[in-house]
């Protein structure tokens, strides 16, 4: 059992699964019903994830065949776009760094989850790969994403490539968008 200032070792020898939340759970000294409700929802999804019932790292994503196929197709499309942009503008490698810094464990969903987190998508819902993508599209700043469009068409300037390098998380969102 772990708590603030308390760590007790498992002396029973029984198999134990440690469940940790990806998200900041708020102030423990100040009780807020909304925060408690949010934490219970996140804890439920963290438990399902720990026992392999759902996938994702930050978001609760369905692990069924359709959602998994969508995740695989998404990652393949993302990798193709990223490779094409990286070959034209090597400075955009910072999107790779943003993805690594996000420390997402589900490789197929990592770009989508990192972009959704940066866009402020609510983690207390159960998603399929498709509905998480739709939630991201609804939450992201479309004008800002469109400002990176010349990088994808090959008509970009050095200034736009530099902006992508300076804003790796935003550029990662644009790659997902």
Regions found by a protein language model. Give the residues of each.
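Patatin-like phospholipase
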Residues: 1-177
């Amino acid at each position: 059992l772990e708590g603030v200032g308390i760590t007790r070792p498992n002396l029973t020898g029984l198999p134990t699964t440690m469940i940790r939340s990806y998200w900041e759970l708020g102030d423990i000294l100040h009780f807020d019903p909304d925060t408690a409700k949010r934490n219970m929802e996140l804890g439920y999804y963290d438990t399902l994830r720990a026992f392999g019932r759902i996938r994702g790292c930050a978001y609760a994503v369905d692990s069924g065949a359709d959602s998994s196929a969508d995740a695989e197709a998404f990652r393949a499309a993302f990798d193709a776009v990223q490779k094409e942009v990286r070959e034209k503008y090597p400075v955009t490698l910072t999107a790779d760094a943003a993805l690594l810094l996000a420390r997402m464990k589900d490789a197929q969903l990592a770009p989508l989850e990192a972009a959704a987190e940066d866009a402020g998508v609510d983690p207390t819902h159960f998603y399929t790969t498709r509905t998480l993508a739709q939630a991201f599209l609804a939450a992201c700043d479309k004008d800002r994403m469109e400002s990176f469009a010349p990088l994808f068409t090959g008509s970009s300037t050095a200034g736009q490539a530099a902006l992508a390098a300076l804003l790796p998380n935003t550029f990662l969102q644009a790659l997902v968008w």
